[in-house]
Amino acid sequence: MQLFPLLFSLLLTSTPGSWARNVRRQSDTWGTWGEWSPCSRTCGGGISFRERPCYSQRRDGGTSCVGPARSHRTCHTESCPDGVRDFRAEQCAEFDGTDFQGRRYRWLPYYAAPNKCELNCIPKGQNFYYKHKDAVVDGTPCEPGQRDICVDGVCRVVGCDHKLDSIKQEDKCLQCGGDGSSCYPVTGTFDGNDLSRGYNQIFIIPAGATSIRIEEAAASRNFLAVKSIRGEYYLNGHWTIEAAQALPVASTVLQYERGVEGDLAPERLQARGPTSEPLVIELLSQESNPGVHYEYYLPANDPGRGFSWSHGSWGDCSAECGGGHQSRLVFCTIDNEAYPDHMCQHQPRPTHRRSCNTQPCPKTKRWKVGPWTPCSVSCGGGVQSRSVYCISSDGTGGQEAAEETQCAGLVGKPPTTQACNLQHCAVWSVEPWGECSVTCGTGIRKRSVTCRGDEGSPVHAAACLLKDQPTLTEPCVQEACPVFRGQAWHVGSWSLCSKSCGSGIRRRQVVCTIGPPGRCVDLQSSKPAEMEACNRQPCHLPQEVPSIQDPRTRSSDPRMLSGPRVSPVSDGREQQWAPLERPRAQSNPREGQDPNLSSAGRAPTLQRPPHQPPLRPSSGPRDCRHSPHGCCPDGHTPSLGPQWQGCPLAGASCLQSRYGCCPDGVSAAEGPQQAGCTRSHGSDNTGNRPGSRAVASKNPKIHQPQAHEGEPSECRSSRFGCCYDNVASAAGPLGEGCVGQPSYAYPVRCLLPSAQGSCGDWAARWYFVASVGRCNRFWYGGCHGNANNFASEQECMNTCRGQHGPRRPEAGAAGHRAHVDGGQRGPGGQQEPDWHRAGATIPRLPSPSGSPWRREQEPAPGEPPHIPAYGNRPGGQEIRPRVPGLDREARPAVPPTHSPSYRIRLAGSEPSLVQAAPGQAVQLFCPGNIPSEFQAGWQKEGRPISSNRYQLQADGSLIISRLRPEDAGIYSCGSHRPGHEPQEIQLRVTGGDMAVFPEGQPRHFPEPRNPDLGHGPPHRGTGAEAGGHRVLSPSHPRPATRLRLDRTQPGVVDASPGQRIRLTCRAEGFPVPTIEWQRDGQLVSSPRHQVQPDGSLVISRVDVEDGGYYSCVAFNGQDRDQRWVQLRVLRELTITGLPPAVTVAEGDTARLLCVVAGESVNIRWSRNGLPIQADGHRVHQSPDGTLLIHNLRPRDEGSYTCSAFRGSQAVSRSTEVKVALPAPAAQSRDLGKDCIDQPELANCALILQAQLCGNEYYSSFCCASCSRFQPNAQPVWQQG
């Protein structure tokens, strides 16, 4: 019994302690609130928070404080400035350019995710979204256009008073805490069902509407569309359905909601408002309309707004960061219709442009690669490399190099090397040799050589190495041919008679062709005579045959007319051909003049080739090729029968004669010191004349004239001539087998050197010299050669230059390459006239009397011919064409003259000078021999040229249009040429007394060809010429030039009634021509027809009666020229033949006619505002404007518009195309055994319900169901 009181007392003593501990546990208290944190946003409503500590006595680490430890409040609730980026979009943009599964995207906000406060973003152009963060930054709106915001990952309510968790809300009129009395509702249901397929207008929401809500009554295949009253679609326009999204429209945010593809759900549109412009709501109808409910609110007691400004939504920002701009349309409206802007001019006009996205751009790192180098080999497997480096981009286009370590974290550094040209190399394949070309003697045999690829198929010869190409031909030796008696002796032509009268002697060559003379004696007893008497008539009678004293003849033998004149010097200098001279007693006053220099007004005379008479008619055969049996293998002896009968055997030549060969390599000398050989031209101190026969002399060098320097290339006489290097022989007429093709922009055939061919039928032809852009003459042997061969200069220029070929640097232009020491060589190595190669013209010299032109003065007897000045070297040294037969030391010094001539300024240490006047155009050529690919680096005063008035031409020259004084300075070019200094040209812009003739438009007004001045452009000035300008000094008389009209101007001009038109007419010549315009032979003169100072005719207010032909007539007192211009007055455009509506059965062809009255009209078709592209299969558009659509389908229905355009005129007409569906069959057709449903793979009922039979993937599982039910095709979808 005593135990219970003890226990009771212990309980009483322990209870107060336990109670005290419980009291202390519950007395955990909050400390004071801390400071408010910075606001999470700078505008638009951010969140700031503060925290307080809990003081607790608990030992387990927990607390017993009741209430939140953090308090939030809104801050910076004022609206953000215009153009600031969406806050959620800024957070998504932080991941732009970062690696995401091996790719880099631009991220946009995605609002349709279930959790509104997660940072879900969607890549631009993709159809998936990704959660980048679990929570957005505090203060981010939960949905666009709404006031609720996210705080700590939870969507919190914000009242209209901008306070967190406030219950104060806006009414439908957007009044905070209002009762809705300041506006009135507009509600209704659009349930019309007689709608056409396509877009149908439902209603118009006026400007100023608030609390807009539009929703389908039930799910359907129809779509809601929104556009402005100007016809600009904001949503689902042009048959393109967009995904659910928030759209900035009419200064509010329009929230568009619909199900994804295959998920039928009613469509819904919501917007807070107020709208800044009327919005047109349409229904894109595809099936019956279940009804569309709509509700919006308008301000109450609106007295009628009258005319007022409306504006559209702001467009996209021009830059994603770093500061851009955006614009919007501002227009005047009343009663939901647009009116001209001046109707609203009494009200302030809203701004239409603002800045946007001013935040700095983030820097991103990425790898950048350079171009691949050429492959190390052309076949068989090689390697090529490229540079790969790390760069940093700032988002505005700026880039800078970065350390590779900064890109080390990026996935997949691009490779720096790769294999290339892995295909097997092509090889030469040879066929067996063919038969020999002869049955006896020596001939040739051929075989076929083909380049074949790795599979044995033939490929182009360029794929094989040309140096390894097997030979195509080789000699073959058959049995010796029988020798006939008449073929043993080779008899040459008679030489000139030793006397012209009184019995002279002449000789000829008689050679045994089969070996020693004894063999010929065995076959033929009598040897033909080698010498006979000649000219035995008395001296008062004419000579019977040509003699040394008078080589003229009436003989038709072409070999009697001229002969080679060879200098017997031992250094192998070239032969020179010239006309035979008359005896001094019969010489004309021009005797002694250089035969290669032309008289004024004539082109330079060609020098004759070897073995060739002057180019004049002759009745006799020209060479052995005209003999009945052709030529012998030596190329000059006529064959006496087939199989080279009577031809000399190999080795039986003049080399076996007693005194050896003459310098021509064919004729045998008749005595020592080349006695009996024909001399080269040029006179000597013994009185022998050119063309005379030589006699033995103790001083053989007496008759040696100066020959031209330079060795003739052996390739020139090959079958196809020389390659571009003038050393190697070409393998074909287009330079096959040649390397190092020049980089001139001319056809390939025009880049080759001249080729004389392998025959001797000499004729003058023309070839193109690409280095100067002109044509030159050369001797052609009559067969083979290459394709750079033309019958006339006009054909040559038209083929190689055409009307718009690369511009030829004019003579005198800086940088023109002067070929001074030698021109193109003719047959036998003779020089062709240098002035043709350089593109210059030998000018006429002015007479002392001051007349503009006269023929050149005759040189005094014994004096060398006078040579006009050809050009100046820097420092005054003059450059002239070489005079054949005249030694360099014997050249006379030509005194300076004021004659108008072309001069060539060679590149030197001083800059070339170009002068021009303001307003003109000037073309600068790079001085020196610089290829065009190195001329592109033009600079002025050491800085790159960037003005749009500077245009770089294809030939590397620079054109400066509309010259200004500030364009003067030092221009340099060729700076990209490795190892060379840039060339400089000084441009001086002056308005002094120098008359400048610009060549600013060379392609539109080509240089003339004056037949009186050779083949160069007309002389228009004197003095130094450079840079494409020709400067005429007023201190010297200007020469007369031929009148010509610019015929490159349009010959047909179209105009519309009421227009002002100009008919151009440009003329050049001196004296300056006057221009007049005529029509029907009468002068054109009226207040509407005015002739301008530049010669053009201006017609004001063109009328239909002004159409017709006009002639421009130019006259300068000496010449007269005219050209015709047709003026066509175009009538108004009209369209006929297109009915308002067309109904075509399904599967048939729709033929839509569009007949347009008018000329030069372009016709375009469109469907529902989108252009129609003809595919050549189902859709065709003929030139007359007819549109054909085969196999018409229901989806082809719509509004088709034919638009006709001509200049600024346009007209259009539309028609509605309806498709008549066939009547349903009474019984279902047999679908066949293969067309069945596959229920184990797809739910066909759902596919039919979702109307996905038009999808190839889904319909493949439900063939039978989709065949029985073919829904109409749906519009194009765009997801994301």
UniProtKB/Swiss-Prot annotation:
Region Disordered, annotated ranges: 541-626, 672-715, 800-902, 1002-1042
Key word Secreted present: yes
Start-end of Basic and acidic residues biased regions: 706-715, 879-891, 1002-1012
Keyword Hydrolase attributed: no
Signal sequence interval, chain numbering: 1-20
Boundaries of every BPTI/Kunitz inhibitor domain copy: 750-800
Biased composition (Polar residues): 585-599
One cellular component term from this protein's GO annotations in UniProt: extracellular region
Residue span, TSP type-1 domain: 27-81, 305-362, 363-422, 424-482, 485-540
CDD domains referenced in this protein's UniProt entry, alphabetically: Kunitz_papilin (cd22635)
Organism per entry: Mus musculus (Mouse)
Residue ranges of domain Ig-like C2-type in the record: 900-990, 1039-1128, 1133-1218
Domain PLAC: 1231-1270
Keywords of this entry: Disulfide bond, Immunoglobulin domain, Protease inhibitor, Repeat, Secreted, Serine protease inhibitor, Signal
GO biological process: extracellular matrix organization
Cystine pairs: 39-75, 43-80, 54-65, 425-464, 436-476, 440-481, 750-800, 759-783, 775-796, 926-973, 1065-1112, 1154-1202
Locations listed in the record: Secreted
Name of the gene this protein is made from: Papln
A molecular-function term among this protein's GO annotations: serine-type endopeptidase inhibitor activity
Family: Belongs to the papilin family.
The protein's name: Papilin
